[in-house]
UniProtKB/Swiss-Prot annotation:
Protein name: U6 small nuclear RNA (adenine-(43)-N(6))-methyltransferase
EC supergroup of this enzyme: transferase
Tissue and organ distribution: Expressed in the intestine, vulva, and cells of the somatic gonad including distal tip cells, gonadal sheath cells and spermatheca.
Family: Belongs to the methyltransferase superfamily. METTL16/RlmF family.
Phenotypic consequence of G263D: In g38; at 25 degrees Celsius animals are either sterile or maternal-effect lethal and display a protruding vulva phenotype. Enhanced nuclear proliferation defects in germ cells in a weak loss of function dhc-1 (js319) mutant background
GO cellular component terms, A-Z: nucleus
UniProt-listed Enzyme Commission number(s): 2.1.1.346, 2.1.1.348
Keywords: Cell cycle, Cell division, Meiosis, Methyltransferase, Mitosis, Nucleus, S-adenosyl-L-methionine, Transferase
Residues that bind S-adenosyl-L-methionine: K82, G108, D131, T164, N184
InterPro entries, A to Z: METTL16/PsiM, METTL16/RlmF, SAM-dependent_MTases_sf
Phylogenetic placement of the source organism: Eukaryota, Metazoa, Ecdysozoa, Nematoda, Chromadorea
Domain of life: Eukaryota
Amino acid sequence: MSQNNEMHPRNPYRNKPPDFKALAVEYPEFRKFCQYVSNGKVTFDFKKDAAVRCLTQTLLKKDFNLDVEIPPGHLVPRVPQKLNYCLLIDDLLKANKLTKNVIGIDIGTGTSCIHALIGARQFNWKFIATDGDEKSVRVAHENVAKNGLSSSICVVHVNPDVKTVLMDVVNTIPDTDYAFCMCNPPFFEKGNGDDKFCEDISSSTETYSNRVASEFRTAPHSATFASSAELFVDGGEVAFVNRIIDDSVLLRDRIKIYTTMIGRKSSLKPLQNRLQRFGDDVKIMISVLNQGKTKRWMLAWTFSKSVSLTTIDRPISFQCPKPGLTRLMQEISILNGRLRQEDTLAIVAEFKCVTWTNQRARKRAKAILSESSIKKAKWNFSNVACQVAFGAGDGKDSYTDAGNFVSSESIPTNNLNAWDNASQAYFPLPNGEVPGPIIRIRIQVFSEDSYDSISFELISGSKQHLHQLVQYLKNLICR
């Protein structure tokens, strides 16, 4: 069953999977692996290694303007999955305000160098990308160069027989601190992956494929070809990640956030238990990476006391009739919100004051102010006391310059001897201080055939304000 709806909320493939028909029209090489069926739709042959490789190259070109070479017989990365991983790291960096001069380490970058290429292109990160295979390093270096990212990504060959994974790389540049490291380790222990991968005898190099090697397995949905080094390692992924943990104990906060992708759920427990032995010195987080028919996990840990790995709140979202973005921007403008483009995926809205609550009281106050002075005097007359303390200054509202006194009204209650009295007053700020936004949110709109899906993510401010605002906008836009 597809898990696309559980992808990272900022992943554009979540609500808009690749349009094979449009890709076939635009890219002749991709068209070779497509077939038109009677209902006018296009089917794609996922069972061919060349087809899967072409799909990845096409998506990288169209959606990220990346021209990437992936040699036959090497692992073909799935773009939505890799973007999910990068977005989770981006969440952690933003939550900890680690967004300037970000330098990361990609362990086992592979021929595609996809983590570093997406990170540099999409998030403006810098990378040291390492690999123990000389061919992978050579091809990765060529991919970086032809995409004009040599100033952002340095591809380094490391000795695969050395036990340490990070120490040599980090100590090469002693005065540099790294924001994060990331890794997609080989999943299988040597000799234990034979039920899922068999050697491809048609290949001139040592290549393995996930073609059916056992009568007890069903045929895979998508072809996977890879070299031995990309699939197998002594001790499997648990042993490999333990080597990263060993280095992290020595490096401590030279790397702020250590992360790795985990391919098998059974690997999480022993790794988590190992990290928990360090007690309060370490913070741990496990996140799920959902995409297509595949589930992976991200294990993150830190020794830095200033870094928080608490679970990041998932954005709130709702669906509405088209054009959702146009109506959303109109309503935010009415609420005196300020919009700016953050990147190709999101816009940011800022509000200096809460203008979306107590709408009935606001409408009543506005109606009172628009009435004639005689009616207003009659309406306001009641035998109650009201005291309003005015601030010192020029008498202007610090947010809207509308004056520091807005309204005072008395409202009858069920008790004949009691009235509810509501007063609203604004006070100017001393010394001409300009307040910052009380809430900042990241908004992303995904377009479907008949509706738009709008996602809201809290950047700063109150969660209560976020929920109030989203509910207010939903009531207006979805009706």
